A protein has these predicted regions:
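AAA+/P-loop NTPase substrate/partner-engagement loops
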Residues: 75-100
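Walker A/P-loop nucleotide-binding motif
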Residues: 48-68
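Short regulatory helix/loop adjacent to the ATP-binding pocket of P-loop NTPases
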Residues: 70-72, 170-185
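Conserved AAA+ ATPase "SRH/arginine-finger" region at the nucleotide-binding site
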Residues: 83-86, 174, 187-199
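Walker A/P-loop
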Residues: 63-79
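Mid-core helix/loop region of P-loop NTP-binding domains shared across ATPases and GTPases
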Residues: 2-12, 16-20, 88-96, 104-145, ...
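A short, basic N-terminal segment
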Residues: 1-48
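Residues at the beta-strand->loop junction immediately N-terminal to the Walker
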Residues: 55, 84, 132
Length: 225
């Protein structure tokens, strides 16, 4: 959550240059071992147009990592699409995917699929990357729709890269028989872990370094944190 304007104003009044432990997009994440591994697998997955699962407990930074990584993709190589509305049905997800690709969805699924193929064709050499956040909350119809869309280009390479972001329950859900077809397509799985004891201090120092202040008392408070 980005800091409230009143909090930012108060920090400025005290001479602080920033607020520690906020999630402004311009702030880099602390590169833990699990984040480094996840980033490597994310880059490999999109390059190969494969399916990847990014999981972890609530609050470990999955969405923060996914968002920053998605925005960092080279626009001359990739066309990123992020969908966060986990309440969508299969038809709704297809419609939103089309809209984000610049197409107006049709009432008939067959017509929408034809538009989707046209959109992929218009992208040329750009690789579409679809990221579904909070994927554990998607209805079975939505996940099944995504699985079928992956096969649009068969027997050629997949039509797009798919990144599923979710909590620890997502992997268990995908292992169920109803989702076995999608589960079998997962080429990589990265789990974001919470900070280890050895990572806590450098993480705190990195964040607090943004809280430089002209007020000596505040700097002493930071040093004692």
């Amino acid at each position: 959550m980005i800091a409230e304007p009143t909090l930012a104003q108060a920090a400025h009044a005290w001479g602080a240059q920033g607020i520690p432990f906020n999630d402004e997009p311009k702030n880099d994440l602390f590169r833990t071992a699990s984040i480094e591994r996840a980033t490597t697998l994310l880059n490999q997955s999109v390059a190969l147009r494969s399916v990847m699962l990014l999981s972890g407990e609530n609050g470990v930074g999955k969405s923060a990592l996914a968002g920053r990584w998605l925005r960092s993709l080279e626009p001359k190589v990739y066309f990123p699409v992020c969908i966060t509305q986990a309440s969508l049905t299969g038809i709704g997800l297809l419609a939103l995917f089309l809209q984000k690709l610049g197409k107006a969805p049709k009432h008939q699924r067959s017509a929408s699929l034809k538009l989707l193929e046209e959109a992929f064709g218009e992208l040329g050499r750009l690789i579409p990357v679809l990221l579904l956040d909070e994927a554990q909350n998607y209805a079975m119809s939505a996940l099944e729709e995504v699985r079928m869309l992956l096969g649009l280009n068969l027997p050629e390479q997949p039509a797009f890269a798919l990144i599923l972001v979710g909590d620890s329950y997502l992997l268990s859900t995908l292992r169920l028989r109803s989702h076995r077809a999608l589960y079998s397509r997962i080429a990589a799985h990265a789990r974001i872990e919470g900070l280890s004891r050895s990572e806590l201090e450098p993480t705190s120092n990195t964040s607090c370094a943004r809280w430089e202040s002209n007020v000596p008392a505040l700097n002493r408070l930071r040093s004692n944190f």
